[in-house]
UniProtKB/Swiss-Prot annotation:
<comment type="subunit">
    <text>Homodimer.</text>
</comment>
<dbReference type="InterPro" id="IPR020103">
    <property type="entry name" value="PsdUridine_synth_cat_dom_sf"/>
</dbReference>
<dbReference type="InterPro" id="IPR020095">
    <property type="entry name" value="PsdUridine_synth_TruA_C"/>
</dbReference>
<feature type="binding site">
    <location>
        <position position="110"/>
    </location>
    <ligand>
        <name>substrate</name>
    </ligand>
</feature>
<dbReference type="InterPro" id="IPR020094">
    <property type="entry name" value="TruA/RsuA/RluB/E/F_N"/>
</dbReference>
<dbReference type="GO" id="GO:0031119">
    <property type="term" value="P:tRNA pseudouridine synthesis"/>
</dbReference>
<dbReference type="Pfam" id="PF01416">
    <property type="entry name" value="PseudoU_synth_1"/>
</dbReference>
<dbReference type="GO" id="GO:0003723">
    <property type="term" value="F:RNA binding"/>
</dbReference>
<keyword id="KW-0819">tRNA processing</keyword>
<comment type="function">
    <text>Formation of pseudouridine at positions 38, 39 and 40 in the anticodon stem and loop of transfer RNAs.</text>
</comment>
<dbReference type="InterPro" id="IPR001406">
    <property type="entry name" value="PsdUridine_synth_TruA"/>
</dbReference>
<keyword id="KW-0413">Isomerase</keyword>
<dbReference type="GO" id="GO:0160147">
    <property type="term" value="F:tRNA pseudouridine(38-40) synthase activity"/>
</dbReference>
<comment type="similarity">
    <text>Belongs to the tRNA pseudouridine synthase TruA family.</text>
</comment>
<feature type="active site" description="Nucleophile">
    <location>
        <position position="52"/>
    </location>
</feature>
<dbReference type="InterPro" id="IPR020097">
    <property type="entry name" value="PsdUridine_synth_TruA_a/b_dom"/>
</dbReference>
<protein>
    <recommendedName>
        <fullName>tRNA pseudouridine synthase A</fullName>
        <ecNumber>5.4.99.12</ecNumber>
    </recommendedName>
</protein>
Amino acid sequence: MSVVRLIIEYDGTPYVGWQRQPNGLSVQQVVEEALAKVCGGPHSLVSSGRTDAGVHARGMVAHFVTPQPLPMAAYREGVNRFLPAQIAVRDAALMPDDFHARYSAVGKWYRYSIYRSPVRSPLACRFSWHVRTVLDLQAMRQAARLLVGRHDFAAFRASGCAARTTVREVFSVDIVDAEEWVYVDVRGSGFLRNMVRIMVGTLVEVGRGARPPEEVGAMLAGGCRKQSGITAPAQGLCLMEVAYAPQDCVEG
């Protein structure tokens, strides 16, 4: 059996998320159906994680197992022929037998996009959070530094999160000032459900002056969701990259 890895980009706006759901169309379902047309039969994708409804991805990683792999071009160009405009396979590679999209991952990079302007942008609204108020980026950076490291992020998870442990390691939180745009780049070993969006919502509240930066430390220590900030809207979040230890492709 051979392991094929796909890197998938998608606009999550019209989907219920990455994972198959009984109540709507998911990115996983659409990609698996396109893959079945190319391969002549069903293949189940195992992803590096899941994204919620409305969240986007530049670098979602998924793998599947097949007894007779096709040329990698068939999984790129071939599958893309059957995908809608909102989804594309960016890369395909034949991997070592022990590669696993989820369990081989050593880190993830999420970017949250904030559009700051008194007037909304129709061209940006699908991929950003429109914030009309002025943001104190220095205060946001001060608060962001407190989130870096290995902590119990119980205060930064969704109420329905069923993770066995709420301890995670955040490698970095960078606030990037780009004229009308503010990007919050978060890198870590892994994240709880809605963790990045709650982190961003909290940082925006700090930037608006609604909370002092040092309050973030109390949130981490308290572990109560009610202490932390709002959950930033889904459309501003994008999974940029999933990191793996150096590993040679068999073919790609």
